[in-house]
Design a protein with these regions (language model features):
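Phosphate/pyrophosphate-binding betaalpha-module
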Residues: 122-124
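An acidic-aromatic pocket/loop used at catalytic or ligand-binding sites
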Residues: 132-138
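N-terminal leader/linker segments that precede catalytic domains of diphosphate-processing enzymes
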Residues: 1-56, 61-118, 135, 147, ...
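Active-site phosphate/ATP/adenylate-binding loop shared across adenylate-forming ligases
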Residues: 142
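Flexible glycine-rich active-site/ligand-binding loops centered on an Asp-His dyad
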Residues: 126-131
Length: 201
């Protein structure tokens, strides 16, 4: 009974989550005040970074004890120099789960005109910033590509011990990759999936 009692104690305060998550990230989808409109602000990752040259939102890895909101605002300030006081977060879009064990929490926020004017990108992280009108995404469908995730087991998997044949029909997976072209920029992948989800709400 001691083992069961210990298990009960552990579950008294347990909050269910998604099994297999190893890393959590948060990004801010920033809508900025520009001449009476509210286009979406994007950044291009600096040279030398992983995935350099890709279009993305400000954001990054959630630190221990940090909420998605705290992470998104911190990263936005670090990457773009926008003070947290100039960002009003008004919602959170559906989180994205990656096949390699990560969760991405996208938050939607409005950046004031003062915050937009204060932008000073970190040269170590951001090559450039640009905006895209919301109506572009509302009126333009992305190109959509799909790639397959095929299971590949090691040759020493114990098929006989678990009672299955070697041609067992393991489940694979599919990943949707939307791609938008805007002027000289390509918005694709995870960032495009976030945008697509927001536009479909």
């Amino acid at each position: 009974m001691r083992e069961l009692d210990a298990l009960k104690r552990r579950y008294e305060s347990h909050v269910p989550g998604l099994l297999g998550v190893r890393r959590r990230y948060a990004v801010l989808c920033p809508f900025v005040e520009v001449e009476g409109e509210a286009p979406i602000l994007f950044e291009v990752r600096a040279k030398g970074l992983r995935q350099e040259g890709e279009v993305c939102f400000p954001g990054g890895h959630m630190e221990a004890g940090e909420t998605a909101l705290e992470c998104a605002l911190r990263e936005t300030e670090e990457e773009l120099g926008i003070p947290r006081s100039q960002v009003t977060v008004f919602g959170q879009s559906d989180f994205q789960a990656g096949q390699d064990g990560f969760i991405l929490h996208p938050l939607l926020g409005e950046v004031s005109a003062e915050g937009f004017a204060a932008i000073e990108p970190s040269q170590a992280e951001v090559a450039e910033v640009f905006t895209v009108p919301v109506r572009f995404f509302q009126q333009t469908d992305p190109e959509v590509y799909i790639y397959e995730l095929a299971p590949k087991l090691p040759p020493h998997f114990p098929y006989e011990a678990v009672g299955i044949r070697r041609d067992y029909p393991w489940r694979g997976g599919r990943v949707t990759v939307p791609v938008w072209y805007y002027e000289n920029h390509v918005i694709w992948g995870l960032t495009a999936r976030v945008i697509k989800d927001i536009m479909q709400k």
